[in-house]
């Protein structure tokens, strides 16, 4: 049952410009991977064939922030690294999104000292938080799917919603 059957024999499909633009944004996100600790290993696992992030249009990992629209910060951010993270975020073109992957990126993790930023949201605005130490690839995929839902609700005016926190992965592993 395709879309042409739902629309009838008119040959016309109606939608809004926001829906088409947001659909395109969700299906062509190019991530800038910022792996700083053990969460980066799980992020690489999510790119493997077992999980296949290319089905979300994310097969192109960008090395340049000027070509990326999604920053995935995975791991702890030190005070010395914070200006670098901010500079890379500022170089990304609009619209841009950030996923904080892991407890260290979300809240500093177990490193409650002067050298570690207590959450990357002190440096850049975060759209989705993925909890875990380290979070499994399924949790990252859940976070990406939540970000897709958030992007589909965005208006062309550019106003963003509040961040989404994923406390536990939606996919349970037995």
Curated annotation (Swiss-Prot):
Class in the EC hierarchy, top level: translocase
Xref: InterPro entries: NADH_UbQ_OxRdtase-like_20kDa (IPR006137), NADH_UQ_OxRdtase_20Kd_su (IPR006138)
Membrane topology: Peripheral membrane protein
Catalytic activity, as annotated: a quinone + NADH + 5 H(+)(in) = a quinol + NAD(+) + 4 H(+)(out)
A GO biological-process term: electron transport coupled proton transport
EC id: 7.1.1.-
Alphabetically ordered keywords of this record: 4Fe-4S, Cell membrane, Iron, Iron-sulfur, Membrane, Metal-binding, NAD, Quinone, Translocase, Transport, Ubiquinone
Assembly, per entry: NDH-1 is composed of 14 different subunits. Subunits NuoB, C, D, E, F, and G constitute the peripheral sector of the complex.
Note accompanying the cofactor annotation: Binds 1 [4Fe-4S] cluster.
Pfam families given in the database record: Oxidored_q6
PANTHER family listed in its UniProt record: NADH DEHYDROGENASE (PTHR11995), NADH DEHYDROGENASE [UBIQUINONE] IRON-SULFUR PROTEIN 7, MITOCHONDRIAL (PTHR11995:SF14)
Subcellular location: Cell membrane
Cofactors demanded by this protein: [4Fe-4S] cluster
Species the sequence originates in: Chloroflexus aggregans (strain MD-66 / DSM 9485)
Name of the protein in its database record: NADH-quinone oxidoreductase subunit B 1
Family: Belongs to the complex I 20 kDa subunit family.
Residues that coordinate or bind [4Fe-4S] cluster: 38-39, 104, 133
Gene: nuoB1
GO molecular function list: 4 iron, 4 sulfur cluster binding; iron ion binding; NADH dehydrogenase (ubiquinone) activity; NADH:ubiquinone reductase (non-electrogenic) activity; quinone binding
SUPFAM superfamilies: HydA/Nqo6-like
Function: NDH-1 shuttles electrons from NADH, via FMN and iron-sulfur (Fe-S) centers, to quinones in the respiratory chain. The immediate electron acceptor for the enzyme in this species is believed to be ubiquinone. Couples the redox reaction to proton translocation (for every two electrons transferred, four hydrogen ions are translocated across the cytoplasmic membrane), and thus conserves the redox energy in a proton gradient.
Alphabetical list of HAMAP family matching this protein: NDH1_NuoB
Superkingdom to which the source organism belongs: Bacteria
GO CC entries: plasma membrane; respiratory chain complex I
